[in-house]
Amino acid sequence: MKKDIHIIGSGFSALSASCYLAKEGYNVTVLEKNDTLGGRARQYKKDGFTFDLGPSWYWMPDVFERFFADFGKKPSDYYVLDKLSPGYEVYFGENSSLKISENLEDIYKMFESEEKGSAKHLKSFLDSAKANYEIAVLDIVYKPGISPLELVTTKTVARVTQFFSNIRKEVRKNIKSSKLIKILEFPVLFLGAKPSNTPAFYNFMNYADFGLGTWHPRGGMYQVIEGMVSLATSLGVNFELNANVEKILTDKKRNVSGLLVNGKTIETTLVLSGADYHHTETLLDEDLRQYSEKYWDKKTFAPSSLLFYVGFDKKIENASHHTLFFDTDFDLHAEEIYDNPKWPTNPLFYANFTSMTDNTSAPEGKEAGFFLIPLAPGIEDTEELRETYFHKILDRFEQLTNQEVKKSVIFKRSFCVKDFKKEYNSYKGNAYGMANTLLQTAFLRPSIKSSKVNNLYFTGQLTVPGPGVPPALISGKIASELIKKNKF
């Protein structure tokens, strides 16, 4: 008889795990508290405009290929990928921007034109980054984080000094241009920590950027979610929407015995949570929780975000599909996220206009705009603050790109700390999970298997391997393999 597994949540890691577990012959049910699937990667449609509510960057295409290949499929069986050209654009001041080409040779030329001799240093840096990528993404990140010995290989031992240096030091060894430094330090922001707190080994993110390029699934990132749901359904996974898990039930021997869902008890013998780890533990009696409130409070979390989804009644100029605005003090903004949590004085921000390359995103002649300001998790969140910062960044956007856009806003929707808590039960309203610092890597992250409750597992951005969409796909695989290994 097939054994039942219930998965809480339907984000990337939960969907990934559901596919692997169904393939192994388990009877899998996914319980989603919201009315649509996808977790943070849901979709928002209004007046002919389409927005991804969450993740908007498609990096590490090989990880997606590897996921679908495990089921005899390809990404192209479910969605169409376009390589973006340019990959993205970075603004450093008024009418001062650099476009990151999809072609590595062009990137070398751009570096050399900005700083003589920098192309040679970039090549050396990317050689190291590629080697680290092959070690990390093709091997280490697929480890379950049970033992420190998982990190010990001949290749990692040879690079041990990189774990005790940091990205900021490595980037600045040979590159002096402030513009180029900002470009090279940008990719590790996806890992949720400051470059000065991110081990130098993580320079593999620069290879993911320059070496593998930036892609876009036609129709948006939600196409990936729909592809995974289609795959899961074909494997026999059941989905239940508006299914709010209120408690995880256990027997006297501390085995999972059931779930309280919308006030009703359902029997199950194994639970895998793709929901927020901290929130999941609050669904247990206090003596069955592995980590105290003090533990969580001491951890370094990735930022929260203030997001705006904006419909414009005209096409936007002087920007790209992905555009970063690094014209203000990065160190001050980082300090106001990690060290002295407060609303940023003069924030960096990110803008995304999918309709520049994908005509499914907006009606003809109009533009779908997505704006993001990284924030400290847990800070005050009011409508007044949201409105203030909307005008702050649109004023800057107009000045830097030399155009008027405010008058062209048809509608806007915001999403911030309160919404991350309400919609995703996110700890302190964080957006990306727990940061990948040296002391929050691999076996030092919250465990994928509960040490106090039998047959309770976790997957997602607070456990291994960490924040981001590709790591979420991998996390689902790791959790499913551990469940199988433990002979459930």
Residue ranges and their predicted role:
Residues S177-L191, L348-Y350, Q403-P465:
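A glycine-rich dinucleotide-binding beta-alpha-beta segment and adjacent secondary-structure elements
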Residues A158-I167, F210-S230, T382-Y389:
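Short beta-strand to alpha-helix junction loop
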Residues P55, Q461-I483:
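A conserved FAD-binding loop/helix module that cradles the flavin
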Residues G93-P199:
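Rossmann-like flavin
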Residues F204-V256:
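Helical element adjacent to the flavin cofactor pocket in flavoenzyme catalytic cores
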Residues K2-A131:
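N-terminal glycine-rich phosphate/pyrophosphate-binding loop and immediately adjacent elements
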